[in-house]
């Protein structure tokens, strides 16, 4: 009898927990994905803050020349970063228990792996949680599809690119100037500016900003008057009201006359689908481009494409970019190798004495 009661009580506790996790009445929805999301994002955040403030220098290139990234070792908010794990570690999984000591783990950049792995699991489960809440509320599932674009971009720079390059030391540093350094080195080694997928991403981000500004300004300029001149226009809208708060016909007529008729949407649903899809597709392409460049399928190379009748090169913009790439490649990791990899790969000319 006692055993039966205990089983029933434990079952009740589990059922209460399940109903609480999946309840849409909570102020913040937890969900089954949230059960994994919350601890992983908390772990990543706490470790990131501690490492950004106090982590000792990391031997990022694996040549016994540690690079300081934390505030306590002389950096500021702009220059500080969680430095990627050492090239000596490569792609090895490097949790704390794999190191001989905590000092060794810190020296080899262990916190970087801890942060990015927990962060990636956290954003994957956040995306799953978006789907889960949409499902519970009977909504369509496109919110998590839109969120998949930044998730794909983060996965590309933190996971796919290091795998393709053979070391987590090539991952993006977790800091402001570290991000810029990553971008410059990426351009030097992969010519990303000449990759069509990156061009699509630029069109997605800049175009999305333009369309967002256009839509916001058109709506704001065609609001239905509900207030006096002395009141804020925002008081003219009541949350949940059934009536349209702006005149889409007026906005359509304005923009159709400003450009031409068919450049203006006359359907609010197709308009908002377009506003969501444009930047998402662009960022998907950029993530795809970074993931292919990870395995050295690089941007277009039009260097020295034009020559005159005497065989002399007529420089184009591609040649200017190439010279800049070589200069950037020479300067980064300057103690790890003496020449850019492009130059080092060429056989030395034979000298006949």
UniProtKB/Swiss-Prot annotation:
Residues noted as binding chlorophyll a ChlzD1 in the record, renumbered to the chain: 118
SUPFAM superfamilies, per the entry: Bacterial photosystem II reaction centre, L and M subunits (SSF81483)
Annotated compartments: Cellular thylakoid membrane
Residues that hold chlorophyll a PD1 according to the record: 198
InterPro entries named in the record: D1/D2, Photo_II_D1/D2_sf, Photo_RC_L/M, Photo_RC_L/M_CS, PSII_D1
Gene Ontology CC, one term: plasma membrane-derived thylakoid membrane
Sorted UniProt keywords: Calcium, Chlorophyll, Chromophore, Electron transport, Herbicide resistance, Iron, Magnesium, Manganese, Membrane, Metal-binding, Oxidoreductase, Photosynthesis, Photosystem II, Thylakoid, Transmembrane, Transmembrane helix, Transport
Binding note for cofactor: The D1/D2 heterodimer binds P680, chlorophylls that are the primary electron donor of PSII, and subsequent electron acceptors. It shares a non-heme iron and each subunit binds pheophytin, quinone, additional chlorophylls, carotenoids and lipids. D1 provides most of the ligands for the Mn4-Ca-O5 cluster of the oxygen-evolving complex (OEC). There is also a Cl(-1) ion associated with D1 and D2, which is required for oxygen evolution. The PSII complex binds additional chlorophylls, carotenoids and specific lipids.
Gene3D superfamilies from the UniProt entry: Photosystem II protein D1-like (1.20.85.10)
Catalytic activity: 2 a plastoquinone + 4 hnu + 2 H2O = 2 a plastoquinol + O2
Pfam family of the protein (one): Photo_RC
Membrane topology of the entry: Multi-pass membrane protein
Protein transport among keywords: no
Family named by the database record: Belongs to the reaction center PufL/M/PsbA/D family.
Function as written in the Swiss-Prot or TrEMBL entry: Photosystem II (PSII) is a light-driven water:plastoquinone oxidoreductase that uses light energy to abstract electrons from H(2)O, generating O(2) and a proton gradient subsequently used for ATP formation. It consists of a core antenna complex that captures photons, and an electron transfer chain that converts photonic excitation into a charge separation. The D1/D2 (PsbA/PsbD) reaction center heterodimer binds P680, the primary electron donor of PSII as well as several subsequent electron acceptors.
The protein's name: Photosystem II protein D1 1
Organism: Trichodesmium erythraeum (strain IMS101)
């Amino acid at each position: 009898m006692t055993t039966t009661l205990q089983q029933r009580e434990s079952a009740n506790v589990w059922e209460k927990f399940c109903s609480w996790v999946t309840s849409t009445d909570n102020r913040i929805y937890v969900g089954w994905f949230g059960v994994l999301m919350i601890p992983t994002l908390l772990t990543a955040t706490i470790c990131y803050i501690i490492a950004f403030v106090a982590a000792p220098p990391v031997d990022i290139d694996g040549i016994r020349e540690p690079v300081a990234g934390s505030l306590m070792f002389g950096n500021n908010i702009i220059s500080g970063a969680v430095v990627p794990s050492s090239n000596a570690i490569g792609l090895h999984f490097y949790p704390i228990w794999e190191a001989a000591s905590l000092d060794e783990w810190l020296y080899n950049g262990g916190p970087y792996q801890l942060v990015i792995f927990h962060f990636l699991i956290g954003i994957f489960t956040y995306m799953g949680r978006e789907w889960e809440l949409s499902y519970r509320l009977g909504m369509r599932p496109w919110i998590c599809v839109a969120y998949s674009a930044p998730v794909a971009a983060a996965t590309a720079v933190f996971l796919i690119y290091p795998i393709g390059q053979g070391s987590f030391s090539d991952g993006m540093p977790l800091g402001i100037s570290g991000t810029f350094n990553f971008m410059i080195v990426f351009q030097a080694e992969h010519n990303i500016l000449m990759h069509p997928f990156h061009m699509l991403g630029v069109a997605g981000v800049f175009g999305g900003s333009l369309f967002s500004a256009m839509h916001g300004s058109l709506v704001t300029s065609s609001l239905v008057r509900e207030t006096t001149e002395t009141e804020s226009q925002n008081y003219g809208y009541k949350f949940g009201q059934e009536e349209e708060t702006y005149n889409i016909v007026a906005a359509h007529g304005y923009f159709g006359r400003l450009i031409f008729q068919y450049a203006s949407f006359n359907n609010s649903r197709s308009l908002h689908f377009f506003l969501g899809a444009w930047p998402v597709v662009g960022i998907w392409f950029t993530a795809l481009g970074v993931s292919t460049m990870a395995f050295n399928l690089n941007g277009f190379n039009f260097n020295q494409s034009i020559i005159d009748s005497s065989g002399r090169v007529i420089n184009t913009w591609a040649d200017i970019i190439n010279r800049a790439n070589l200069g950037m490649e020479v300067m980064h990791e300057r103690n790890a190798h003496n020449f850019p990899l492009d130059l080092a790969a060429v056989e030395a000319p034979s000298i006949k004495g």
